[in-house]
């Protein structure tokens, strides 16, 4: 484990150096210069208001993991803590393309919004939504019908594979609806509506997932209740975020 930790730190350091060299080199369109590295308060406020969304998402994910591991250790023991680790690894791999689609759409949406091209922004939202939904639906199908194949990638232990297969189907039951959350939050961040993005990030993780993670096992669902909290939050939080986006930002741009 020590070797893995050291390797992670080394990879992060190398990645940081590589990015800094590129951004300060001749190939960068806007190269970094030390003499121009100044802090402008009016820009800092906007940067922080949007950047805090990502921070909150990471922080709430950690909070959820703490709650999940605590409840699983009580109701299921080390086996189910390991199962959650396997499922989280699968989830991280599956969410990367969806995040890539929505994150990649942000500059396009922001540019056209700033240029006043509202119909292009609306078209971009539709395309992004369709692409993300098609992908998450295909990923959901794969997780439902080939869970054993996915679990074997991350563990050779048969007992853990069997437990992971059962819980993976529960955990991924609402994965398709996660695309609604990604798309809605991406639109809010692209338009600079940070308050909406923060609100729905907190809604899904802090208001829905954490309480359900603590409550469902206590009402007789045991370890299944811990994994069931995720699909419930995906459905409720995802639909709430996307419908709000359609009724506010998307509708407003249709009038302009």
For the regions a language model picked out, list residue spans one by one:
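Small-residue-rich hydrophobic transmembrane alpha-helices
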Residues: 69, 81-141, 145-147, 178-200
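Residue-level hotspots within the lipid-embedded alpha helices of multi-pass solute transporters
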Residues: 9, 54-62, 74, 92, ...
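Hydrophobic alpha-helical transmembrane segments in multi-pass integral membrane proteins
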Residues: 209-217
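Short helix-loop-helix connector
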Residues: 72, 76, 113-114, 155, ...
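Transmembrane helical elements of multi-pass membrane transporters/channels
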Residues: 8-15, 19, 23, 41-104, ...
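Short, well-ordered coil↔helix boundary/capping segments
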Residues: 38, 78, 87, 99, ...
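Functionally critical, cavity-lining and gating residues within the transmembrane helices
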Residues: 3, 61-65, 77, 99-103, ...
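Short alpha-helical transmembrane segments in multi-pass integral membrane proteins
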Residues: 1-51, 109-174, 216-256
């Amino acid at each position: 484990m020590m070797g893995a930790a050291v390797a992670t730190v080394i990879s992060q350091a190398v990645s940081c150096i590589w990015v800094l060299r590129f951004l300060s080199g001749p190939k960068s369109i806007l190269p970094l210069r030390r003499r121009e590295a100044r802090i402008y308060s009016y820009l800092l406020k906007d940067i922080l208001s949007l950047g805090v969304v990502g921070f909150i998402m990471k922080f709430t994910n950690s909070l959820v993991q703490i709650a999940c591991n605590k409840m699983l250790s009580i109701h299921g023991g080390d086996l189910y803590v390991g199962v959650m680790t396997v499922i989280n690894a699968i989830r991280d791999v599956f969410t990367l393309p969806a995040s890539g689609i929505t994150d990649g759409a942000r500059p396009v949406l922001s540019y056209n919004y700033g240029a006043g091209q509202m119909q292009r922004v609306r078209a971009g939202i539709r395309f992004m939504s369709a692409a993300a939904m098609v992908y998450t639906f295909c990923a959901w199908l794969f997780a439902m019908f080939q869970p054993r194949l996915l679990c074997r990638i991350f563990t050779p232990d048969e007992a853990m594979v069997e437990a992971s297969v059962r819980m993976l189907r529960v955990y991924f039951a609402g994965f398709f609806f996660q695309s609604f959350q990604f798309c809605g939050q991406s639109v809010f961040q692209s338009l600079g509506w940070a308050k909406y993005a923060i609100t729905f990030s907190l809604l899904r993780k802090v208001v829905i997932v954490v309480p359900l993670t603590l409550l469902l096992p206590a009402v007789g669902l045991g370890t299944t209740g811990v994994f069931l909290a995720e699909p419930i939050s995906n459905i409720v939080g995802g639909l709430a975020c996307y419908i709000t986006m359609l009724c506010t930002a998307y509708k407003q741009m249709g009038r302009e």
